[in-house]
């Protein structure tokens, strides 16, 4: 009985230390999931009001005017700060039939915007001409979607403008988003996504992303994790966190990053974008990971149960090993000389 209690005490102490370390680490790292990040979110009411102002549609007197976060950052009567450019990427100029409607909806809604479709050849030439130090890493990516990811960061940093995935159609004009120095959209569970985003040229957030591409260019065992952590949404979400921690208090206007809520992104009458079938790069491992995310509570409970069972079995076997037993026995049976004999020695 004592032996079982001893084993369990060691097991509990080690796991308490590990769990405490993990909780403290994630509490410091994941501001993207914390309530204190709500100050970065663009309120839906603010966007609706901006669209009304830009469309010369005066809100009803009965409708309360929102308190604009933008008022303290930028005067909307002035010029927008993000250039009127739409960037998209594909392998060639021949866009798949299923995405032509989405592509055309963005072009038709923005006749006064410059439209650039970055093909694989154009992307590589752009990197070679403007950022030759990165070309070896660009060519070495094992998945083409990684190159599609990084080119959007480089062109937004270089030219500014708005990036839109080809599987995102446009429902609203983007004019009201051009008054924010950087806008990204919120997503679950990774913080922010990279399928739609906008930026002024040479913004420090995109500079930080580019600076970390070389360090993140490694394999993470599964294709889905490799893409997400090297160039995808997880990588820019972690860097979003890092960037926010480096900002002065209060930050300057051009340092700000604004976050678009899910309802303003898609699936509502006021949303900027419409949904088309996409995620063509997802493999079987992505399906497993996404299934786990949809059943996260069950996965966490099952994972903890499995972890505790296996870790207890490991500790039990370790404590029964002859090396540990020899150490414990030697400590317990170490003879103690009488005081008189100790003085003689």
Curated annotation (Swiss-Prot):
Q: Where in the cell is it found?
A: Golgi apparatus, cis-Golgi network membrane; Golgi apparatus, trans-Golgi network membrane
Q: Which residues cross the membrane?
A: 4-24, 220-240, 296-316
- What broad class describes the main subcellular location of this protein? Golgi
Q: Name one Pfam family in it.
A: Gly_transf_sug
Give the lineage.
Eukaryota, Fungi, Dikarya, Ascomycota, Taphrinomycotina
Protein name in UniProt? Inositol phosphoceramide mannosyltransferase 2
Q: Name the UniProt key words of this record, in alphabetical order.
A: Glycoprotein, Glycosyltransferase, Golgi apparatus, Membrane, Transferase, Transmembrane, Transmembrane helix
- SUPFAM superfamilies cross-referenced by the UniProt entry: Nucleotide-diphospho-sugar transferases (SSF53448)
Homology family = Belongs to the glycosyltransferase 32 family.
Q: Domain of life here?
A: Eukaryota
Q: What is its EC number?
A: 2.4.-.-
Which topology term describes how it sits in the membrane?
Multi-pass membrane protein
Q: GO: which molecular function terms? A: mannosyltransferase activity
- A cellular-component GO term for this protein: trans-Golgi network
Residue positions the entry lists as glycosylated: 55, 269
GO BP: mannosyl-inositol phosphorylceramide biosynthetic process
Q: What does this protein do?
A: With imt1 and imt3, is required for the synthesis of mannosyl phosphorylinositol ceramide (MIPC). Catalyzes the addition of mannosyl to phosphorylinositol ceramide (IPC). MIPC is essential for cell morphology, cell-surface distribution of ergosterol, localization for plasma-membrane transporters, and lipid-raft-mediated endocytosis of plasma membrane proteins to the vacuole.
